[in-house]
Every structure is written in C-alpha cells, then in structure tokens.
Amino acid sequence: MQQAARAAAALPPRAHCLLACGSPAPLATRLQTCWGVTAPPRARRLSTAEGRGLEAGASCDDPTRVRTNVFKAAIRPSPEQRRQIGLWTGLRSTMVAEMISHVSGLDWFVIDMEHGPNELGDVLLQLQASQRGRAEPVVRVPWNEPVAVKRVLDLGAQSIIFPWVNTAAEAQQAVEATRYPGLGGVRGVMSLARMNNYGAANPGYYQEAAEQICNIVQIETVKAVENIEEIAAVDGVDALFIGPSDLSASMGHIGKPQHPEVKACIAEAFKRIAATGKASGFLTANHDDCKWALTLGCNFVAVGSDMQMLTAATKAAAADFHAYCQML
C-alpha cells in the first residue's frame, strides 16, 4: 500500500486525471481535480413549446409530465388563430424529418404510412429526429384500425391522421383507438414504452395522454361529405381533413381534383366544417389552391410533399441547364 501511494505521488500532476476519471465523483469535481478548472453551469434545455416561442404546458425533458401537443391547440378555430402550414413526407428519411422540424419554418408535417413506404421502425426514427423541433410530426396510419394506431402511439406519436373515415361510427372507432379502457377507448396498455418515457415516474400518463393526442379524420368520399356534421360531433375528433384526390375519384372525376364540381364540393365542405366548430385541413401541391383553401377558412394546410418538391426542382434544374448548354 505504501509503495502504491509513493508511486502515485511520483506521477505528473495531470496523470492524476486518469485516476480521477475512474472516480464516481461528479464531473465538476473531477474537472477541478484533474485540471484545476470549474465546470460551467449546465444550461436548461427548452421544451418543445418554449422552443416555438409559445407558452409551455410541460417540458419534453420532464419525465413526470406528458409532452404538450402545441399543434393540437394551434389548429383550433378562433378569430386569432395563426394558420398552420405543413408538408407531406414520404421519402422515409430522418434527415428530411429533422430538417423540416428544426429549420424549415413549417408548423407541421406528415409521416405517411398509408401511401408512403414508412414502416413502424421508420416512424420511430423520424419521431426521434423531430419531436424536439418546431414542426409537429403527424403520423397518417395505414388504416383506421386499433392495432396500427396503438403501435404508433406507443412510439410517442401524438397527432394522428385516420384515412377513409366515412361515418360517425368510423370516427368513433378512431377516437377509441387512442383512449384507454375506462376512459372511453380500447387502446392496449403498455407500461414501458417511449410514449410514457419508458415508465419513468409518470403515473399520470394513462389519465392525461388523450388530452394531448390530436385526432384528425380524413374526408375522402361523397359519403363522408354527406356525414360531416355527424362525424364532427364525435367527442375526441379534433379536425376533419379533406383529401381532394380520393374525393375527386369518389365523384367520378379521378385525377381531376380541380374539376369545378370537386372544388364546389370542397368549398361547401369547408363551410360546413367551420359551422361545427372543428378544425379543417387540406393538402394540395397547387399553391393557388392552398391559398384558396385558406381563404375559405381552412385551419391547416399541407402545401405539397417532399417527393413532389424534389421532383419539380430536379426537373426544372435539368431543363434549365440542358437548355443553357444548347446555347454554348
């Protein structure tokens, strides 16, 4: 023991860092021991809501609280509402999700499981990349089916689009998939998952989860349009989202979402949704139609998709430079 102590005393001062690094002492203490410096105070990370410049209901970093869904509150109709601008995504890319959420300036974006190639693991990675950013990730599930919804919710998704909802009964089925038994639903209970911080001191999750889940049902057929008031009356439905492509097909104008009859139907649908007090959503790559929808009172719009924008920009660049090269 005495020989070991003498050997340690003979070490150069900085070499004691190797001994201190194995110590269970706090990092600040080890820095002082090794290098004679004082660690700076640890900065507090902002919650998602604070990062958006909005009032924070609960920090993302607090494992005892359910993450506040700022998007759910932001789409609620009101005279002061700031319309929410978003984008559809189907490239199955965590980098796209991160870019949109952190630097694009958009308010929301869709991770599409119905028509996109996203599987459950892809959704998880995109949620992890985006949920601390500004834009809310909204997952469109492949179908209005409780198992698919349960698995997405367990990953931590809080905003869900349900495709092909035609009746109040189907809207009720969608809502029940997001709520636990005894609280109006059939959602399966999982105690250790991402949605409740892996069970970390969050006993209120099961009671509070539904308050922060945003349920968006898609209106994509003539039948759904006929049932707008009944669908909107279902408790737990937060928004009705008009899908112009499927709606035009349902009306006999497949591939022609700008047909006058289709646009007249959509305009009437916006008016009726507004009368119910629920939010309305819309998707189109045509920016004039996006502005038209906003003028009609639409509360949140997707102004295109990642694939569509990449394709259009690539084709435009190729045409521009091929034309330029012909002039050389």
Task: Write out the residue ranges for each language-model feature.
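Expand to "…catalyze enediolate/carbanion chemistry for C-C bond making/breaking, isomerization
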Residues: 8, 18, 40-328
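N-terminal chloroplast transit peptides
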Residues: 1-30, 34
